[in-house]
């Protein structure tokens, strides 16, 4: 397994998992304000 391929997969997983988290955090902050 290439290191570049592994880094690409990890970055994809981070982006996919961070997307909804950012949306939830922003909506939570907006709701609190």
From Swiss-Prot:
Keywords: Chloroplast, Membrane, Photosynthesis, Photosystem II, Plastid, Thylakoid, Transmembrane, Transmembrane helix
Gene Ontology biological-process entries: photosynthesis
CC terms in the record's Gene Ontology section: chloroplast thylakoid membrane; photosystem II
Membrane topology value: Single-pass membrane protein
Keyword Mitochondrion attached: no
Recorded family membership: Belongs to the Psb30/Ycf12 family.
Function as written in the Swiss-Prot or TrEMBL entry: A core subunit of photosystem II (PSII), required for optimal photosynthesis, probably helps stabilize the reaction center.
Alphabetized NCBIfam families for the sequence: PRK13686.1 (NF010239)
Protein name, UniProt field: Photosystem II reaction center protein Psb30
Species: Chlamydomonas reinhardtii
Taxonomic path: Eukaryota, Viridiplantae, Chlorophyta, core chlorophytes, Chlorophyceae
């Amino acid at each position: 397994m290439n290191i570049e391929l592994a880094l690409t997969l990890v970055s994809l997983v981070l982006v996919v998992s961070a997307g909804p988290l950012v949306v939830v955090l922003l909506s939570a902050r907006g709701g609190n304000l």
